[in-house]
Amino acid sequence: MEEVEAANKAAVESCHGVLNLLSQQTNDSKSIMVETREAVCKFKRVSSLLSRGLGQRKIKKLNNNNYKFSSSLLPQHMFLESPVCSNNAISGCIPILAPKPLQIVPAGPPPLMLFNQNMCLDKSFLELKPPSSRAVDPKPYQFIHTHQQGVYSRSKSGLNLKFDGSIGASCYSPSISNGSRSFVSSLSMDGSVTDYDRNSFHLIGLPQGSDHISQHSRRTSCSGSLKCGSKSKCHCSKKRKLRVKRSIKVPAISNKIADIPPDEYSWRKYGQKPIKGSPHPRGYYKCSSVRGCPARKHVERCVEETSMLIVTYEGEHNHSRILSSQSAHT
């Protein structure tokens, strides 16, 4: 930093020397040029010291700019007020130097860079001009807006969901008329979305084809009463069949988990599961009175009353009651 300050001080002193020579009424142009070159060289040294460490590309760019600046720093018409000789006899004339008063320009904001139209790459692509009051071309926005209007104007009354697998099958179509706009007016299970004016589009990624529709029609042919509409074997899933559940609260026999109160059926334990928030697990039992009976029950200890058990029965027995003195457990 000290080296930069010393070089800057020497350059400023050399510049003052040039100004002193210009203020004197002398005809010694050679000494003025020598002093000017010396001042320029000193300023170049200051510039090189400041640009050290900024990279070779930065230094090369600064050196080129300094060279252009030094070549156009002191033009000839700065020293010559009015040349006596003409262009034809320029070799035999002596230039008369007339000093000009120095003008101090106040510091202000840097001038704006003005670009010509020829410097722009393309008027439609890049044009450096002050922003005008005209609005941007609204064509793209109008296209998007009209497209959205075309989509949303078809379903102002609400949402209509259709779950129909084939023609003639029962469908479920709840309509929601809350006044809200929705671009979907009808959803069907075959992967298509249909609006009120019968224009449809297919959802991407959903399986389509006759096999999928036929399978869905077989599945939806079952009614809610657990009776299949076809005469062949029912294709309904067993998990979807509603099971009758009823819960009762009975007093516990002992503190053991395996001890449950007996009833009119024989039960066999086939598993247990921990309950969240309770230290006692839940035991699962199946009816062992008749093989293949679908009846199940699970027993758990009541959290509020540890002396009581909650017994939940699930499913119905497919046989008559068999009285037993005690239940069988494993």
From Swiss-Prot:
Q: Which residues bind DNA?
A: 256-322
Question: Where is it localised?
Answer: Nucleus
Q: Which gene encodes it?
A: WRKY74
What does the UniProt keyword field contain? DNA-binding, Nucleus, Transcription, Transcription regulation
Identify the PROSITE patterns for this entry.
WRKY
Keyword presence, Transcription regulation: yes
Q: What sections of the sequence does the record tag as coiled-coil?
A: none
Q: Which GO terms describe its molecular function?
A: calmodulin binding; DNA-binding transcription factor activity; sequence-specific DNA binding
State the source organism's domain of life: Eukaryota
Is this entry keyworded Transcription? yes
**CC per GO annotation:** nucleus
PANTHER family in the record: WRKY TRANSCRIPTION FACTOR 21-RELATED
Briefly state the protein's biological role: Transcription factor. Interacts specifically with the W box (5'-(T)TGAC[CT]-3'), a frequently occurring elicitor-responsive cis-acting element.
Q: Which InterPro entries does UniProt cross-reference here?
A: WRKY_dom (IPR003657), WRKY_dom_sf (IPR036576), WRKY_plant (IPR044810), Zn-cluster-dom (IPR018872)
| Species | Arabidopsis thaliana
Read off the Pfam families from this record: Plant_zn_clust (PF10533), WRKY (PF03106)
Q: What is this protein called?
A: Probable WRKY transcription factor 74
